[in-house]
């Protein structure tokens, strides 16, 4: 099985979790503390764009 990356972080408890963990509860909430405000984690790689 392919390991799923952790994409979201809770603004209250600070835990990171994946979308599949978030789908356990109805609606968009933290699966650990049931808080509604979550943030998507940015990717660690830098996107380079050539200058025009």
From Swiss-Prot:
Keywords: Cytoplasm, DNA-directed RNA polymerase, Metal-binding, Nucleotidyltransferase, Transcription, Transferase, Zinc
Cofactors named for this entry: Zn(2+)
Entries under SMART domains matching the protein: RPOLCX
Subcellular location: Cytoplasm
Enzyme category, top tier: transferase
Role, per record: DNA-dependent RNA polymerase (RNAP) catalyzes the transcription of DNA into RNA using the four ribonucleoside triphosphates as substrates.
Assembly behavior: Part of the RNA polymerase complex.
The name this protein goes by in its record: DNA-directed RNA polymerase subunit Rpo12
Species, as recorded: Pyrobaculum arsenaticum (strain DSM 13514 / JCM 11321 / PZ6)
Source taxonomy: Archaea, Thermoproteota, Thermoprotei, Thermoproteales, Thermoproteaceae
């Amino acid at each position: 099985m392919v390991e799923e990356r952790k994409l979201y972080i809770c603004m209250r408890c600070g835990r990171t979790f994946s979308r599949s963990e978030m789908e356990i509860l109805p609606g968009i909430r933290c699966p650990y503390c049931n808080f509604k405000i979550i943030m998507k984690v940015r990717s660690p790689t830098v996107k380079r764009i050539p200058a025009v």
